[in-house]
Amino acid sequence: RSTQGYSSAASDVYKRQAEGMKEDKESWRSFFVWLKERGLTGVRLIIGDKNLGMLETIPEVFPDARYQRCTVHFYRNIFSVTPRNKMKAVAMMLKAIHAQESKEAAREKARQVAEKLKEMKLSSAAKKLQDGIEETLTYMDFPTQHWTRIRTNNTIERLNREIKRRTKAIGAFPDGQSALMLVCARLRHVAGTQWGTRRYMNMEHLSKLEDDLLSDIIAG
């Protein structure tokens, strides 16, 4: 089980990996509590796939955090009930939703796409879209400069694929701790050579947005 986070400086990247075989609520709760015990605070947004164990745990451990469903995982879920010969057209329609410049516009676009899917005899795809679209739009409440960075968890997915490739090449491990040591070694390498040399997001945009919201509340 892994998580990746960014500090207020946005040049500090935190990657945490722990051995875990289950995706239930208790496993996620133990993982999140472990992160807090190691000093994690001020979590504002958690990005992930539609994992019920994680979703049930977030309000308990990180009550101030918002949840953003990864748009890529959301698309894949809709593709699971879409005929292969219609996937390209459906993909273009889905991307158009998240290309909108406001949450209201995205909601309206999603409504239009759902109607179009029904016309295409893709009622199951339309239902998945209608049922899940709202939790994919959380990123739109954050600075527009951050949108492309926080609507998916592609960064951690790529890293997880790399870790899987390396562990598969080795084969069997004597125990879970041995595998975890290999994973952590790879994470240290990536953090030191890639993440440590670039700024992932300019967090000044988020600070300004929060200041503006606070001013509106005081004035209102």
PLM regions: where:
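Single conserved hydrophobic/aromatic residue that forms the stacking wall/gate
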Residues: R1-Y14
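Short, conserved catalytic/metal-binding motifs centered on acidic residues
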Residues: D12, I46-D49, C70-H73, L129, ...
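Active-site beta-loop-alpha junctions of metal-dependent nucleic acid enzymes
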Residues: Q17-G39
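A generic short alpha-helical patch detector that favors 3-5-residue windows
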Residues: G20-D24, I46, Y67-C70, T82-K86, ...
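Conserved structured core elements
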Residues: K22-R29, G48, L52, S123, ...
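A general structural motif
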Residues: T41-V43
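Conserved beta-strand -> loop -> alpha-helix junction used to position metal-binding or nucleic-acid-contacting
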Residues: L45-L52, T57-M93
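Acidic/histidine-rich catalytic cores and adjacent linkers
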Residues: A96-G220
